[in-house]
Curated annotation (Swiss-Prot):
Disulfide bonds: none annotated. Suppressor of RNA-mediated gene silencing, also known as post-transcriptional gene silencing (PTGS), a mechanism of plant viral defense that limits the accumulation of viral RNAs. The P0 protein suppresses local PTGS using its F-box-like domain to mediate destabilization and degradation of the AGO1 protein, although not via an interaction with host SKP1A. Participates, together with the proteins P1 and P7, in the inhibition of the induction of aphid-induced host phytohormones. This could play a role in the attraction to the infected plants by aphids. The keyword Metal-binding does not apply. The F-box-like domain is required for suppression of host RNA silencing. This is Suppressor of silencing P0. Keywords: Host-virus interaction, Inhibition of host innate immune response by virus, Suppressor of RNA silencing, Viral immunoevasion. The keyword Cytoplasm does not apply. InterPro entries: Virus_P0 (IPR006755).
Amino acid sequence: MIVLTQSGTLLFDQRFKLSKFLFVVIATGFPLLLQQASLIYGYNHEQIYRICRSFLYILPLLNCKRGRISTSGLQLPRHLHYECLEWGLLCGTHPAIQIVGPTIVIKLDDPTTAAAYRSELLRVSSSSYIQNAAGLSNGWGHDMEAFVRNAICLLELRERSIPQSGLRDLMGNHQHLVRSLLDACKVDHFVPLDFQHRSLMLNFARLYNQLDLQGRAKSFRALTGFPVYVPSEDYLEGSFLQKELQE
């Protein structure tokens, strides 16, 4: 189901819809895959490190409600494009993301750069701003000077909001990352699928709670379903209750 490349990236060799069963199979099969990479195929520490980074990035996305894996990559609904870009920056892993109609295809074997992800985030967020500002008389100013001033301000705000890698503490230690992933993959194989899935979710939630999600815990939880800790103030952000309390 998952195959490895010499560069240390992960590929899918079959086509499946995303499901609890697929998530459990891939998560519980990862320790054996890593063992084979090290003992049978002789992957070095750097290759093992890249494999673990790729797995850390892709596993939460396999828990999305809709999508599929195929030989071309991981296919998800297009509206998750922005969140996947943010997650890639947080995770320090930047596979190419191709837009195909109503879906995006995450090409795990085609790495890009953090700079490319930041550029795409700026493009997407700026396009969204322009669309929302359409029809507003003062959306971009009444003259060229105001337009330039507002555009520069927008770009500066967007650049400051783009996440940096949040995995420095966890990713900086190769052995700690490998051990953490292997521990999270442990599950009782003699219990029903739902119990295995729930156990894995909790295991990986503890792992991802170690990461600096930079205020994006709520969107990460919505994207993946992982029960990571979300500060109460983030839950209230933009809500009716928050507006009432602020008045």
